[in-house]
C-alpha cells in the first residue's frame, strides 16, 4: 500500500493551516497514496498555554467545520486521512487524533492518555486525557494510534502492543530547545531512541512531526516510516514542508 506522511508548516491562522493540509491531501491522492498521516495538533500546532481563555479556541469538535471538511475530502478523493488536532467537548480540551475513512466516517478516534501536552498547572477540569487505546480493522490491516509522548510511556506502549496492530500511526509535535544542530542531534542520537521504542510494537509505523514556524511553534518537523523490526524504510528531513511517500507491505516486514 502506498502511504504518505504529510508535514505542514504551522501558521497563526487555523484557516491557513487547513488550506495547506487540504493541498497536501490532494497532492497525496493525486500521487496514488491510499493513506495520508498528518502530525499532532496539525490544525494549530501545539501552542496551548494552559490558559482556557486562550486555548479553548484551538479546539475542534469532531462534528465541526474542519473535521467535516476532512471527512468530505476523504470521501471525494478516496483516501484515508489521519491527523492530530485539539478536540473540544463540553468545554474540555483533549490532544486527539482521528482516522477518517473514504466512506465518510471517522473510523477511529484516540485521545492522548498522558498529560505531557500541557503543564501540571493546567486546570484539570479543562485539560483532559483519554483512558483507552483502540484498534480498528481496515482493508489494509489493524490500525492504532500513539500520540507523541505516549510512545515513551510503558503502559501506553504495552496497551497498543496487546492490540496486535499491523500499522501504528504516530502524530507528534517534538521540539529541541538549546540544541545547536538539530538535524545532526536527531540523526546521531535521538532518532535511535525512538526506533528502540517503535520496535517494541512489532508493527509497521508512520511518524509525522509537527513543523513550527519558529515564532508561534518550535517543533522541528520530519517524518519516518518504520517496519516491524524497527528499521527505517523511508524518512523526510527536518524543517521541511512536504510529503514522504512509502510503499508498505503491511502483511510482512517492509
Task: Say what each PLM segment does.
Residues 3, 17, 25-54, 74, ...:
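Active-site beta-strand/loop signature of hydrolases that rely on acidic residues for catalysis
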Residues 1-9:
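Short beta-strand segments enriched in small/hydrophobic residues
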Residues 30, 92-94, 218-220:
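Short, small/polar residue-rich loop motifs at catalytic or cofactor-binding pockets
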Residues 9, 87, 149, 211:
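Residue-level signal for short, function-critical loop segments
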Amino acid at each position: 500500500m502506498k502511504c504518505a506522511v504529510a508535514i505542514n508548516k504551522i501558521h497563526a491562522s487555523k484557516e491557513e493551516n487547513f488550506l495547506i493540509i487540504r493541498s497536501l491531501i490532494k497532492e497525496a491522492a493525486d500521487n496514488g497514496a491510499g493513506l495520508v498521516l498528518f502530525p499532532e495538533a496539525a490544525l494549530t500546532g501545539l501552542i496551548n498555554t494552559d490558559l482556557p481563555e486562550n486555548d479553548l479556541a484551538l479546539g475542534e469538535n469532531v462534528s465541526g467545520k474542519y473535521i467535516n471538511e476532512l471527512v468530505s475530502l476523504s470521501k471525494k478523493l478516496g483516501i484515508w486521512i489521519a491527523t492530530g488536532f485539539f478536540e473540544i467537548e463540553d468545554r474540555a480540551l483533549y490532544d486527539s487524533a482521528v482516522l477518517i475513512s473514504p466512506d465518510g466516517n471517522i473510523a477511529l478516534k484516540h485521545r492522548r492518555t498522558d498529560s505531557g501536552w500541557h503543564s501540571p498547572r493546567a486546570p484539570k477540569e479543562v485539560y483532559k486525557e483519554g483512558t483507552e487505546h483502540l484498534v480498528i480493522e481496515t482493508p489494509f490491516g489493524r490500525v492504532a494510534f500513539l500520540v507523541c509522548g505516549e510512545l515513551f510511556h510503558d503502559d501506553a506502549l504495552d496497551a497498543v502492543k496487546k492490540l496486535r496492530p499491523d500499522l501504528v500511526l504516530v502524530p507528534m509535535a517534538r521540539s529541541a530547545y538549546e540544541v545547536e544542530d538539530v538535524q545532526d542531534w536527531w540523526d546521531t542520537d535521538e532518532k535511535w531512541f525512538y526506533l528502540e521504542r517503535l520496535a517494541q510494537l512489532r508493527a509497521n509505523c508512520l511518524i509525522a512531526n509537527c513543523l513550527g514556524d519558529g515564532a508561534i511553534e518550535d517543533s522541528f518537523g520530519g517524518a519516518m516510516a518504520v517496519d516491524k523490526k524497527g528499521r527505517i524504510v523511508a524518512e523526510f528531513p527536518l524543517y521541511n514542508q512536504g510529503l514522504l511517500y512509502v510503499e508498505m507491505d503491511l502483511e510482512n516486514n517492509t
